[in-house]
């Protein structure tokens, strides 16, 4: 019968730990500056900013989720910080079509980026 060295057992354990952690979302505090627009336009139209406030509001009222399109092109999906979860459109709708500054907790997993918004405000000359 072969014996397995302690180093080999430890190596297997470390691999299992890292594989297990790969599925865990990474979170960190963040402040994001960008435009609030509907998710369909963010993906399908290649926009840098919303066409208009009315367009973003109309799509949101029809059920499209609002997102924040950051200055660097990252799309942030607003999510609730508790479960059962709720949609975040009511929080974003007053800012539809506007440039905002949002702060909260960032989550990244599987190539997606989300934010639990603690504070959101329209970006003005004073807070740029």
Predicted regions and their residues:
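Bacterial N-terminal signal peptides
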Residues: 9-22
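N-terminal secretory signal peptides that target proteins for export/translocation
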Residues: 1-7
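OB-fold and OB-like single-stranded nucleic-acid-recognition modules
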Residues: 23-128
């Amino acid at each position: 019968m072969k014996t397995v060295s302690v180093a080999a057992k430890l190596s297997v354990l470390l691999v299992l730990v890292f594989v297990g952690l790969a599925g865990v979302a990474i979170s960190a505090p963040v402040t994001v500056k960008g435009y609030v627009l509907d998710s369909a336009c963010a993906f399908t139209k290649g926009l840098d900013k919303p066409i208009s406030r009315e367009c973003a509001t109309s799509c949101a009222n029809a059920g499209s989720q609002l997102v924040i399109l950051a200055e660097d092109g990252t799309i942030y999906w607003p999510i609730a910080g508790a479960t059962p979860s709720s949609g975040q459109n009511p929080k974003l709708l007053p800012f539809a079509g506007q440039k905002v500054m949002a702060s909260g907790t960032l989550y990244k997993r599987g190539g997606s980026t989300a934010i639990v918004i603690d504070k959101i405000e329209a970006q003005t000359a004073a807070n740029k």
